[in-house]
């Protein structure tokens, strides 16, 4: 979604300058051309009054452009409010003024030109207008891109320890239109999360109403992708959040975690080491360092086909890594004695270390931490008796020390409040597998695993766990409409295109274990869909509009035979039709529904794993179609190591 820009400026004619023309001819087109959605209060303020929706934009807009050409009290009021509550995102513009007041002057200021036209008031100078617009567009873009390089507000310059209010504290309840837009978007994000549709979340994350929401959106998208094991895509989302807010602690932690999941252990340790130096009292960061060390240790000895004895031998050889993990977890527990996650991991690894080495080096420390974990868990359960993590931590402690029946009761108690959360249950399963693989209290570990596995089987029965071997996406030209000036896909070239698509699918061995995405339009989409169904490929058809509108816009103009083919494709048992407005909500203002639909397909395909994606396009290689267009899809798939196959229409006919 476009960045929001709020314009603070005089209205009408003031001091013989037509500011309405300054806005309509200079400011608005320059900012919109740079990709901003522009807001301006639509009437003069009275005694500092401003419409609540516009005041909300003033507070939360990504950029405020203040026209300081004259000393207008309304503009000074708006600029003062912004400077007081936001440190960044302001640029000043002016005409006919040789100086700026010293306390608001920054390098974020720009001069534009007006020309006298008696008896009419001065207006933007036509001779300079294009140059002025280009400079403003570039200036605005640079300001957004340099968001965290320096503070613009003189208030935050003079008070370096003053912190901006959290954006949620700047909510104006009366600004209904603004918050209805946000709440509708947030609801869609939550629905997509509950449906476990990371592709939907990625589209919605791109559509966050303003910059302050983009951090939240990127974090939610990252969390959803992490939960389905798409670590590379998840990392991109957290890096997007950090590009906006580099000091966002949660995103910093998750980046470290994901670097570890991607087995970039050295890079992960370097990242987390820097984090614990910056936040030495943050238990979560210490626990994350422990997690990186632990994962690296497990990865060094675990392997398919290895016996328990072989894994124990190799684990012992890497004892130094487990010591580092124990120290990090124990430090986190000392920093925050209520952080039982750190405590249970330190205790578990101490037991495993003792079992592997045959030496009980720190029994006193271990026992103290055991009791501390029990105390913490009891306190957590007093606050929330249905806290899954507290209950399962108690079970993870019992599996280390208690009889099998006690272990079973503890895991049953945890599963009862898991609320069918696959991620939580699978995380607990991995902890038990660690014990089983190293032959530590195997009967008790297997008893816990049996309970967790039963719960997981109820969430994901076999028929719902199908995953494709290959994921195909298609983008291609529609059949040319009658009278099209520049031919692109003439109707008489249908057989050539169909043969090229079929040959490419055969070359890629498309078959029953695969999944395909397309848009369902006449021409390339339909030919691809038919070829996929002939080969037993499951087909996801994504429509940018409700079905009647889509058929009218993208199918029916080519003739009744294409409509018949659409319904035949739809009736196939391997076809699923998804309507974008039903799944994602209405297309945002200023967004292209076709581009949005293409991104929806692309992100959903990538969420299955970039290595599985095969992008086939029937394309004339002409770019310039923007985000969601064929060129953008080609570049995005290539970025994530997916494979691209271009059927070049300039060579086919």
Where are these regions (language model features)?
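Short glycine-/polar-rich loops that comprise or flank the Walker A/P-loop
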Residues: 3, 60-62, 86-90, 105-108, ...
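Acidic/glycine-enriched connector segments
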Residues: 23-44, 51-62, 66-67, 96, ...
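C-terminal interaction surface of TIR/SEFIR-family domains
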Residues: 108-192, 575-581, 585-590, 601-605, ...
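Amphipathic alpha-helical repeat scaffolds of TPR domains
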Residues: 173-195, 199, 210-227, 245-257, ...
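TPR/TPR-like (Sel1-like) alpha-helical repeat modules
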Residues: 326, 333, 347-351, 407-421
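Terminal, low-structured helical/coil segments at or just beyond the last alpha-helical repeat
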Residues: 430-462
């Amino acid at each position: 979604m476009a960045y929001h820009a709020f314009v603070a400026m005089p209205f009408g004619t003031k001091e013989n300058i037509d500011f309405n023309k300054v806005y309509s001819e200079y400011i608005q087109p320059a900012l919109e051309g740079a990709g901003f959605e522009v807001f301006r209060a639509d009437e003069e303020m009275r005694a500092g009054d401003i419409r609540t929706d516009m005041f909300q934009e003033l507070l939360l807009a990504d950029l405020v452009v203040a026209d300081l050409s004259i000393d207008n009290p309304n503009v000074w009021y708006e600029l003062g409010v912004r400077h007081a509550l936001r440190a960044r995102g302001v640029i000043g513009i002016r005409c006919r003024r040789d100086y700026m007041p010293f306390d608001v002057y920054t390098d974020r200021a720009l001069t534009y030109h007006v020309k006298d036209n008696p008896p009419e008031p001065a207006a933007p100078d036509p001779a300079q207008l294009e140059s002025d617009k280009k400079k403003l567009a570039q200036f605005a873009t640079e300001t957004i891109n340099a968001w965290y390089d320096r503070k613009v507000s003189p208030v935050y310059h003079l008070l370096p320890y003053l912190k901006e209010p959290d954006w949620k504290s700047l909510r104006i309840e009366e600004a209904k239109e603004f918050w209805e837009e946000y709440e509708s978007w947030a609801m869609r994000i939550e629905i997509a999360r509950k449906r476990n549709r990371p592709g939907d979340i990625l589209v919605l994350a791109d559509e966050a109403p303003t910059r302050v929401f983009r951090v939240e959106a990127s974090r939610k998208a990252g969390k959803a992708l992490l939960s389905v094991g798409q670590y590379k895509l998840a990392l991109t989302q957290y890096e997007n959040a950090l590009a906006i807010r580099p000091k966002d602690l949660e995103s910093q932690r998750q980046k470290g975690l994901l670097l570890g999941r991607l087995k970039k252990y050295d890079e992960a340790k370097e990242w987390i080491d820097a984090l614990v130096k910056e936040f030495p009292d943050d238990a979560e960061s210490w626990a994350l360092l422990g997690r990186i060390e632990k994962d690296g240790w497990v990865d060094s000895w675990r392997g398919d086909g290895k016996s328990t004895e072989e894994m124990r031998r190799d684990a012992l050889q890497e004892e130094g890594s487990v010591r580092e993990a124990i120290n990090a977890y124990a430090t986190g527990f000392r920093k925050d004695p209520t952080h039982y996650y750190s405590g249970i991991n330190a205790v578990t690894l101490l037991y495993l270390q003792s079992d592997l080495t045959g030496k009980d080096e720190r029994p006193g420390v271990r026992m103290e931490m055991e009791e501390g974990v029990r105390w913490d868990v009891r306190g957590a359960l007093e606050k929330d008796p249905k806290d899954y993590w507290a209950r399962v931590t108690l079970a993870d402690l019992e599996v280390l020390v208690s009889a099998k029946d006690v272990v079973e009761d503890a895991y049953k108690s945890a599963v009862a409040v898991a609320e069918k959360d696959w991620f939580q249950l699978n995380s607990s399963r991995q902890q038990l597998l660690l014990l089983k693989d190293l032959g530590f209290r195997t009967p008790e570990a297997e008893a816990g695993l049996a309970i967790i596995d039963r719960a997981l089987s109820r969430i994901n029965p076999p028929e719902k766990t199908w995953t494709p071997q290959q994921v195909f996406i298609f983008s291609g030209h529609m059949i040319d409409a009658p009278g099209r000036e520049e031919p692109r896909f003439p109707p008489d070239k249908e057989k050539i295109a169909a043969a090229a698509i079929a040959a490419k699918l055969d070359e890629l061995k498309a078959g029953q274990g695969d999944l395909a995405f397309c848009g369902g339009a006449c021409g390339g989409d339909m030919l691809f869909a038919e070829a996929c169904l002939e080969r037993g490929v499951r087909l996801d058809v994504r429509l940018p509009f409700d079905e009647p509108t889509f058929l009218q816009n993208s199918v029916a103009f080519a003739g009744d035979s294409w409509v018949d083919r659409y319904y035949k494709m739809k009736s196939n048992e391997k076809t699923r039709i998804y309507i974008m407005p039903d799944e994602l909500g209405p297309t945002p203002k200023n967004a292209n529904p076709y581009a949005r639909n293409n991104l929806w397909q692309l992100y959903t395909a990538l969420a299955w794993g970039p290595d599985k994606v095969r992008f086939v396009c029937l394309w004339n290689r002409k770019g310039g179609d923007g985000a969601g267009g064929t060129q953008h899809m080609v570049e995005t798939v290539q970025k994530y190591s997916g494979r691209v196959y271009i059927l070049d229409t300039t060579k086919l006919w």
